[in-house]
């Protein structure tokens, strides 16, 4: 019996403009997966579209069709074996020809394809594989023109995109360029076999006390015969835990394992993200013919929605433990998707863990990510909120579209269902908001799917019928949510139910970020504030020295957000003393972003302790797809902005918070208040009660001296997984204590300072922050690590260290107050390298 064999078709390709029939038109392709922009750049036919205005120079590529071709030798084919040509992804309108005969036509980027080419490869010798990629931009416009009755409305990009199953951000978004890729964007190979394990999956039943788990393992067998047997082995850290053998019934072999005292999969910060390995080996006639394995986790995951005093809850519970989901939204990490390596994916997820984030939302305008992305999330304990790929639009529902969408959903849920990191599937991004804003028909009480198809919002059929049925069938233990935002069919801005995208800071009514916590809902799955990336990133795409000023054309070109000039200007001028030199301007935008994220996260985490009022906060956005100015808190080159560190501190396992009442200075003729209230609290995600000491000092901004007696609370009992209020009715008498002062809080547990927070008078522009007496001393040095000791004579706001590639700082964007030295560890900086530069407000 012949065993399974596969032959990669990654090399030997060439490509050309489909309309150029000259002999010299063909150009080499280094390897696939790739997309045409990568191959054009490699052949010096295109310059890096991420630099300067070169995106415009690349626009001609968007309206072209392309042909890829390779010649390969027929592999050895044992008697009785089949040869399968397998494509894991074709972008997007692809006609595949083998020896001149069409064997596949595809129009969905998110689907894999398997074609039996046994007969087509009958002859030995060379075989020609050719793929014509039709222009997706033009095909989309043709499809739109064929259905003028449909309401083609949405946000971002050409509305025609909604007729094509291709990554929607390729049409351009408010943070990314218009780069219409085409190509073999995922692996292609030949498989030769008589039989194989086509799929392997598990279903887990974990006992309430976690002392035992039953794992049911299933293997779908293709080509099974009467002698077929599947050997299942469950292992942990390379050690066998259990094994069993089963014969396929109706092409599926099934076994059940009883695991005593299982090691559970936990999000980072709550326990180890333990992974078991399940393998399935197919034996026929006493010989092994194929084997596959997958990593799985034993855990329960649920979304708790129950009536309460705030409305209806929305939070995640893992293994019986309520988890406040502090995290980020994820967009594709590059416009040229095949250029993202597994190592780069892992660095992104490692950065999240470094920032104490526990959830990432894969946004619905990108793609179902590469396996290595989810593997990193599994291994590092980052939960995944997985959108289906629909974003910001009113999607058509032609019969062929619905058929393609269902296949897409089935393929991707089956591909991803073994990942313990995936805890929720969500139907779309903001499509229900499009429905609301455009006045499309949506009657939540109408439960007849055929009526939905007849309405002017027909995609409800996708989100409330096709997708939930696919998830229920193929991943029944995973929660499904119709859209983001969405809550029981109510208006998407309802703060009492479901999840919410809160954009009234930056977009919408442009509220002050100081009140962000009052604007949230039950789960804040989008919110954000723009900031410039670091100067090193700007220098990558700004070529000319004369363009290095804040309002230059090239900088505006690299900020795709509508109205970004006035929004950035508004938040800067309201809060800070503005500047016109680029380096200072960059820093000031970063201060605003860091403060915005802090005010939001800090308040919403506090609300977690109030009957789970807020179940989580996923900022928009973690990352960028090109070097740009956006809402990202880490730029394209994985360089964290100050907001990254501000969020990490608020998500500390135990965090102290202090906040005074901030009066709106811009609507009261800037009249200072006579009195202000303040509050002091501790937020904890620990699962046991903790005792600590809390101190609150009142320090003059001008002198650094204490202006009133400090408050100390010893032996504070900190409640587990919640909020402990220390002071709820504090009062500052501004007539008695007239000089501006900070409220500096510290928390000790077991004699060690574990958390700090500093509340500042608002706005910063009214404060004189010169002459801070800041001292940064190097107190220890090794080959690649330095420890800095930082002190100040007067309060310092937002001390930010330079970001260098390969160098990691343990903290940044810090507030330093007199009498409280802080340490920062710098890893990866060689002893002979120049010290990191730093900047603080008022410097």
Swiss-Prot record:
Which reactions fall under this protein's catalytic activity? Answer: Hydrolysis of terminal, non-reducing beta-D-mannose residues in beta-D-mannosides
Can you name this protein? Beta-mannosidase B
Further comment: In contrast to clade A beta-mannosidases, which are likely secreted, clade B proteins appear to be intracellular.
Q: Does Transit peptide count among this protein's keywords?
A: no
Which organism does this record belong to? Aspergillus terreus (strain NIH 2624 / FGSC A1156)
Under which pathway is this protein filed?
Glycan metabolism; N-glycan degradation
Q: What is its EC number?
A: 3.2.1.25
Similarity comment: Belongs to the glycosyl hydrolase 2 family. Beta-mannosidase B subfamily.
The regions listed as transmembrane in this protein's record are none
Q: Taxonomic lineage per UniProt?
A: Eukaryota, Fungi, Dikarya, Ascomycota, Pezizomycotina
Which residues are noted as glycosylation sites?
Answer: 721
Functionally, this protein is described as follows:
Exoglycosidase that cleaves the single beta-linked mannose residue from the non-reducing end of beta-mannosidic oligosaccharides of various complexity and length. Prefers mannobiose over mannotriose and has no activity against polymeric mannan. Is also severely restricted by galactosyl substitutions at the +1 subsite.
Which UniProt keywords are given for this protein, alphabetically ordered?
A: Carbohydrate metabolism, Glycoprotein, Glycosidase, Hydrolase, Polysaccharide degradation
Instruction: Locate the active site.
Output: 430 (proton donor)
């Amino acid at each position: 019996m012949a065993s399974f064999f596969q032959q990669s078709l990654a090399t030997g390709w060439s490509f050309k403009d489909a309309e150029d029939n000259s002999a010299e038109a063909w150009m080499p392709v280094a390897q696939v997966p790739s997309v045409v922009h990568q191959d054009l750049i490699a052949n010096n036919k295109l310059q890096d579209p991420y630099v300067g205005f070169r995106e415009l120079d690349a626009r001609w590529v968007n309206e072209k069709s392309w042909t890829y071709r390779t010649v390969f030798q027929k592999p050895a084919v044992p008697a009785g074996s089949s040869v399968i040509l397998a494509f894991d992804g074709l972008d997007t309108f692809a006609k595949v020809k083998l020896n001149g005969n069409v064997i596949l036509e595809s129009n969905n980027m998110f689907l894999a394809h398997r074609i039996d080419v046994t007969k087509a490869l009958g002859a030995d010798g060379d075989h020609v594989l050719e793929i014509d990629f039709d222009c997706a931009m033009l095909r989309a416009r043709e499809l739109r023109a064929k259905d003028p009755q449909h309401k083609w409305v949405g946000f971002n990009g050409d509305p025609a995109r909604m007729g094509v199953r291709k990554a929607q951000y390729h049409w351009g978004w408010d943070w990314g360029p218009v780069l219409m890729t085409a190509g073999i964007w995922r692996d292609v190979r030949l498989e030769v076999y008589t039989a194989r394990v086509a799929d392997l999956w598990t279903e887990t039943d974990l006992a309430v006390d976690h002392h035992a788990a039953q794992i049911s393992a299933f293997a779908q067998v293709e080509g099974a015969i009467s002698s077929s047997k599947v050997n299942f082995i469950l292992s942990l850290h390379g050690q066998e835990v259990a094994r069993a053998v089963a014969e396929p019934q109706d092409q599926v072999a099934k076994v059940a394992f009883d695991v005593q005292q299982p090691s559970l999969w936990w999000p980072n910060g709550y326990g180890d993200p333990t992974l078991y390995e399940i393998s399935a080996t197919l034996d026929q006639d006493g010989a092994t013919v194929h084997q596959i394995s997958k990593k799985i986790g034993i855990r329960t995951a649920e979304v708790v929605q129950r009536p309460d005093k705030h409305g209806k809850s929305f939070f995640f519970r893992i293994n019986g433990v309520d988890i406040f989901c502090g995290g980020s939204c994820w967009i594709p990490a590059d416009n040229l998707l095949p250029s993202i390596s597994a190592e780069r994916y892992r660095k992104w997820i490692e950065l999240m863990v470094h920032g104490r984030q526990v959830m990432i939302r894969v946004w619905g305008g990108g793609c179902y990510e590469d396996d290595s992305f989810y593997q990193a999330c599994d291994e590092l304990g980052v939960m995944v909120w997985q959108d289906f790929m629909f974003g910001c639009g009113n999607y058509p529902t032609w019969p062929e579209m619905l058929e393609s969408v269902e296949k897409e959903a089935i393929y991707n849920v089956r591909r991803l269902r073994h990942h313990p990191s995936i805890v929720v599937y969500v139907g779309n991004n903001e499509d229900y908001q499009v429905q609301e804003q455009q006045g499309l028909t949506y009657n939540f009480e109408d439960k007849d799917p055929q009526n939905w198809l007849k309405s002017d919002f027909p995609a409800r059929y996708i989100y409330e019928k096709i997708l939930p049925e696919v998830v229920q069938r193929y991943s029944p233990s995973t929660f499904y949510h119709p859209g983001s935002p969405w809550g029981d069919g109510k208006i998407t801005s309802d703060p009492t139910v479901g999840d919410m995208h809160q954009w009234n800071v930056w977009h919408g009514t442009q509220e002050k970020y100081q009140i962000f916590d009052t604007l949230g809902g039950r789960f804040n799955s989008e919110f954000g504030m723009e900031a410039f990336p670091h100067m090193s990133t700007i220098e990558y795409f700004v070529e000319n020295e004369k363009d290095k000023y804040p309002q230059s054309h090239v900088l505006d070109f690299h900020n795709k957000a509508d109205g970004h000039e006035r929004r950035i200007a508004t938040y800067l001028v309201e809060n800070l003393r503005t500047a016109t030199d680029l380096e200072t301007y960059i820093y000031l935008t970063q201060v605003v972003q860091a403060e915005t994220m802090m005010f939001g996260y800090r308040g919403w985490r506090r609300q977690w302790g109030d009957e789970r009022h807020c179940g989580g906060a996923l900022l928009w956005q973690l990352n960028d797809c090109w070097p740009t100015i956006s809402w990202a808190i880490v730029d394209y080159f994985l360089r964290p902005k100050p907001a990254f560190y501000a969020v990490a501190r608020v998500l500390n396992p135990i965090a102290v918070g202090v906040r005074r009442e901030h009066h709106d200075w811009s609507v009261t003729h800037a009249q200072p208040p006579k009195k202000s209230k303040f509050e002091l609290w501790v937020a904890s995600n620990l699962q046991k009660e903790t005792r600590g000491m809390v101190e609150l000092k009142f320090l003059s901004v001008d002198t650094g001296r204490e202006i009133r007696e400090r408050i100390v609370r010893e032996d504070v009992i900190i409640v587990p997984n919640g909020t402990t209020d220390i002071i709820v009715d504090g009062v500052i008498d501004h007539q008695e204590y007239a000089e501006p002062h900070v409220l500096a809080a510290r928390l000790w547990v077991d004699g060690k300072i574990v958390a700090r927070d500093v509340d500042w008078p608002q706005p910063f522009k009214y404060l004189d922050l010169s002459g801070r007496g800041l001292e940064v001393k190097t107190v220890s040095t090794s080959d690649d690590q330095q420890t800095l000791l930082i002190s100040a004579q007067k309060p310092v706001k937002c001390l930010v260290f330079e970001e260098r590639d390969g160098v990691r700082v343990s903290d940044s964007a810090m507030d330093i107050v007199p009498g409280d030295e802080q340490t920062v560890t710098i890893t990866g900086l060689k002893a002979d390298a120049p010290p990191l530069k730093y900047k603080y407000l008022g410097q």
